[in-house]
Structures are given as structure tokens and as C-alpha cells.
Amino acid sequence: MHSNQPSLQRVLGPIMAIAMVVGTTIGSGVFKKAFALSQETPFFAIILMLWIGGGIFTFLGALTYAEVVSLFPKAGGNFTILKEAYGPMWGFLWGWVDFVMIRSASLAALASIFADSFFDIFRIGIPLWGKLAFTISVLVIMAYVNVRGTRLSASLQVFITSVKVASLLMIACIPLYFLVFPMEPNPVSKTNLTPVWPGEEGVTFSQLFSAFLAILWAYHGWGNIAPVSEEVRDPQRNIPLALLGGVGLVTLLYVSVNTAYHLVMPMDSIRNLPAGSTVATEALRISFGSAGALFASAAIMISVFGSLHGNLMAGPRLLYAMGQERMAPVALQNLHPVYNTPALAITVLAIWSSSLVVLGGLASSLGFGLSLFDLLTDFAMFGSVIFETMAILSIFVFRRIRADADRPYRCWGYPFTPILYAVIPACVLGNMFFASHMVNGQTVYTHHTELYAGLVFLSIGTLVYWLIIRPMSRKPVS
């Protein structure tokens, strides 16, 4: 990077940093994944424990990640962390996986849910190609907003996050509303929580870990403060504050909202949800009629919009950092001459995400056994589980090789905190190889489509590094 190359500006304060964590974490999962959980573990106590466990798991990650990120408050996030901890190949592979799989698939999935909610609100029937075109147009508009400036994008993120948190609080307060204003028939009932515990049939570990894969998607995004850390003011203070405060707020909202869902809807109703609907929409339809369903669809749109916007804000900073290190085309490090944003990186990410919308729509229409949303989210989680766990475990490396570095924040509970965190992803990843169900007397492996696709992309990335990136990065700068 040349000395006269313009740099990113530190314009994000503590409120904007917290909004980044909360806004990119709360997206579609709290609305969409309740159905997936009911298919794997149709017992209220188990489901509630999974949501609480997901929060504890994420909090353990945040406790560790806050120390690691505060050591490297630079654009790139995990790219910089993995490169410094394990070597340049691992930094590149994270960038490759994040671009090709995690970030782009997440953006495609979120834009798809935004489109579904839009058509649901306005009751528009539309063929698949029309939905795909609308989904891509959403990505294009979001990319344009992010090109226009970091401060503008961050201010929009704070506003959207405030609205989505308020919406979730309103949903969480449904039981309280009917307690204060009872009516007949009262949609809220403790009997809806049955069955609370599994009976003789029990729940297998495979079912629990498959269910936890859905939980991982719902909590995914809390680490998105890392790629924009170069733009956070006083990062050693504000990044730990954003991570710990943001994760705590998200966990409280998730547990409260899902309790409200189950107090309103019996488990059988959730398990047999109409195609194209969500638990949130049906719960509010039962509670407040068509007006409630309309509110739920609007809340989903706003929530997904915020997560989509935050991810499109964070993702290009990784490509920008890779361009600086010559592990991606160097043009990606160029900033817009007026708005001082990584405009080319934003454009490239939006184009690839749009391509995944088309590919995912094609795979879904050809009957791969998953909805477009579930296919994209499970695909994203495969790469995320591997590399984000490596980033958490890098704390052991940095405690050794950077023992004397200034640490304004130190991981609470070290070394047990990162070790406990790493156990769950290892189990979830292993379960992706073996989880199965019976269809017409035949064993069908639940996650093999996205698993093998992920392994192929990871293998391609390894070849790209050794054949192209490593030789290119060793050439002297002209």
C-alpha cells in the first residue's frame, strides 16, 4: 500500500458499534428458524435451552474475540487475525471462504427473505424469476447506499437497529399484553407449551446438533464489528463494549420472542406451518388478525434489511484489506475519491451475491430438498464454523507470540472460555457429515448438499492460493 493511498476514517462511535453487532446479528433467524427447530426437537424446554445455549455459546465467543480483535483494530477482521496467527494461507482461505460462501450466501439469503416479506405484505403472486430479479435489485440498492459513505451507512444502521429492537420487544410483550387486557378466546395459554420435555422417544445428539446449526445462523453476525474495526473510534474500549453488550441484548430478545411464539402457538401448529409463512407471522395473525400478520411481515422486512445492510457494510472491508496485502486484486484497496469507501469491493461482493441468488434459486427449483433460504444459510454456516472457531482459538497463539502486547481487555475465564466455545462447533461440523433422515425407506443425509459444495469451494481456494496468490504476493512491488 502506498503512503499516499487514502485510508479509512474512524467515524464509528460506541452506539454505532453496538448497532453494528446487534443489527447484523438480528436478521431472519429469529423469525425463520423456529420452524426448523420444531422439526428437529419438538419440545419447548429443549428449544428454549437451545436458544439460551446459543446465547451462552456466543457470549463465550465474544469474551474471547474482544481480546483478539482489540489487538488488531484494522479492516479485514478475521483475515488479519488468521494471517497473523497461522500464516498467510489461512488468512487468504478465510477471505476466500467469506467472499465465496459465508458473506455472499448470507447476503443472498437475507435479500431472498426481504423479497418474500415484501410480496407477502402486498399479497403479490410472482414467478420464481420475478422474485430473483427483485432480490437482486435489493442487493444493488444496498450496495449503492454503502458506496455513498460510512457515516451515512452507520447512521442508517443505528436507525434500522432501533426499529427492529423495538419490533422484537413488541412481539416479546404479546403474553404480557393479553395478561393485562384479557380476552376470549385468549390466544396465550401455558398449554401451548406442551410437550415440554421428550417422552420415551427422546432426542438424539444428532437432532440436537442439527437444531443448533439453525441456532448458529440466528446468532451469526455478532463478529461483524471486526471487519470495520479500522473505522471504530477508541477501538480498544468500544469493540469489547459492542461485542459483550450487543450479544447480551440479542440473547435476551431471542429468548423472550421465542417464548412468546410458543405461548401463542401449539407445537403442532408450528411444525405444520404453511409453506412460505413464518412462526412470527402466524403468531401475530392468531393474536391480532390480519393487522398482526402485516406487522410481522413488516418487522421481518426491517430486521432483514438491517442485517443485509450491515453485512454489505462489513464484507467489502475484508476485500479491501486483502487488496492491500496483494491476496486479491490490488484494485480492491482503492477508495471512492468522493465518499472514501471501498466502492469496487462493495460492487464485487454485490455481484457475486447476486450470482448466488440465481444459483440458489436454480438449485431450489430443481428439488435439492431444501428451500432457497435453508440451502444458502447451511452453506454459509459450514465455512463459518471452521474459520470463526480458528479465529477464537488464535487467542492461545497471541498469548504466546504477543505476550507483551498492550491488552486493555483480557478474556475473562481464559483458557477455559475459548476451549468451551470450540467444543460446540466441532460437534456441529461433525454432525453435518452424519445427520440423516428416512425418506420412503431410504436414508437421506440432511446436510450433504451444502457440505460437499463447501468442501469443493474450500479445495478450490487452497489451489488458488498455492498456484496464483502465493507467487503473486512474493513478487516485488513495482
Map each language-model feature to its residues:
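Helix-loop-helix junctions that connect adjacent transmembrane segments
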Residues: 3-8, 47-48, 125-130, 162-297
